[in-house]
Curated annotation (Swiss-Prot):
Role this protein plays: Odorant receptor.
Record topology, Extracellular segments: 1-62, 117-137, 196-233, 297-309
GN (gene name): OR1L6
Major localisation: membrane
Species lineage: Eukaryota, Metazoa, Chordata, Craniata, Vertebrata
Source organism (scientific name): Homo sapiens
Full protein name: Olfactory receptor 1L6
Length: 347
């Protein structure tokens, strides 16, 4: 019996012995291999990117879609309600609530830049984003996110003036000054985003176009570049320190001054009242900056895909979803504004 004939018989025997129950597993494996080959072919033949998302497990895609859809709707509806509630109640027409209404608007924009594309990718096979779409997402993500941080700093300054210098509050925090603070926050944030996107657009991308994240963030995209990214990484770290740390230090300084002033108040009731006006804002600051500091303020060599995804979900989805509850649950003025809005709707 020839060698080739014996080899043919052995192959047929193996096929006969293959259990029928293993066929679905075999088909699933072949399908996955085919999909992986399609992704590799796509990434090597176009200028687009593949977003791997939160998980590559096909069985988790629909549950994750449902979870993030609910979180997005809660964030959108909650922040949308905050804005008319503030503007419908004249007693909420103060600098603090002016900044809060704009923070709610920025939170809506911030989550909308990320989550809708994320939801589409949960139900998609290839999870494609174009090169221009990736840069656009990066630009608006940073613009709205940085504006959020400056608005949180503006709210801290408002509390500082209200508690430490109440007699000059109306002069310092008059509407014109508040509007200038808002315009300054937006201008600095958009200039920062433009600079970052121009820097990223100069990078070259070779074989792999697969981003190990659920959106186009700076560090995952830098990881893909076949250019020398040492200078880009240094510039990114430096200007990130300038843009993000500056409002954070402003918040820290404001609350240190507030703490010193409050501790000098003789009555316990007065101390509690002063601290209670800052509690919700401090909670929002801790949620927002805690995850941002973890994600951005460490070297690229320490980048971890899983931990970064979890931390990024915290400040891109969870914090905007929780902010309306944080600012309204223990706030009598906001509760009154929401009640007045409800009465107008159902009148």
């Amino acid at each position: 019996m020839s060698y080739f004939y014996r080899l043919k018989l052995m192959k047929e025997a193996v096929l006969v012995k293959l259990p029928f129950t293993s066929l679905p597993l075999l088909l699933q494996t072949l399908s996955r291999k085919s999909r992986d080959m399609e992704i590799k072919n796509y990434s090597s033949s176009t200028s687009g990117f593949i977003l791997l998302g939160l998980s590559s497990n096909p069985q988790l895609q629909k549950p994750l879609f449902a979870i993030f859809l609910i979180m997005y709707l809660l964030a959108a509806v909650g922040n949308v309600l905050i804005i008319p509630a503030i503007y419908s109640d004249p007693r909420l027409h103060t600098p603090m609530y002016f900044f809060l209404s704009n923070l709610s608007f920025m939170d809506i924009c911030f989550t909308t830049v990320i989550v809708p594309k994320m939801l589409v990718n949960f139900l998609s096979e290839t999870k494609v984003i174009s090169y221009v779409g990736c840069l656009a997402q990066m630009y608006f993500f940073m613009a709205f996110g940085n504006t959020d941080s400056y608005l949180l700093a503006s709210m801290a300054i408002d509390r500082l003036v209200a508690i430490c210098n109440p007699l000059h509050y109306d002069v310092v925090m008059k509407p014109r000054h508040c509007l200038l603070m808002l315009l300054g926050s937006c201008s600095i944030s958009h200039l920062h985003s433009l600079f970052r996107v121009l820097l990223m657009s100069r990078l070259s991308f070779c074989a792999s176009h697969i981003i190990k994240h659920f959106f186009c963030d700076t560090q995952p995209v830098l990881k893909l570049s076949c250019s020398d990214t040492s200078s880009s990484q240094m510039v990114v770290m430096t200007e990130t320190l300038a843009v993000i740390v500056t409002p954070f230090l402003c918040i820290i300084f404001s609350y240190l001054r507030i703490m010193v002033t409050v501790l000098r108040i003789p009555s316990a009731a007065g101390k509690w009242k002063a601290f209670s006006t800052c509690g919700s804002h401090l909670t929002a600051v801790a949620l927002f900056y805690g995850s941002i500091i973890y994600v951005y303020f460490r070297p690229l060599s320490m980048y971890s895909v899983v931990r970064d995804r979890v931390a990024t979900v915290m400040y891109t989805v969870v914090t905007p979803m929780l902010n309306p509850f944080i600012y309204s649950l223990r706030n009598k003025d906001m509760k009154r504004g929401l009640k007045k809005l409800q009465d107008r709707i159902y009148r």
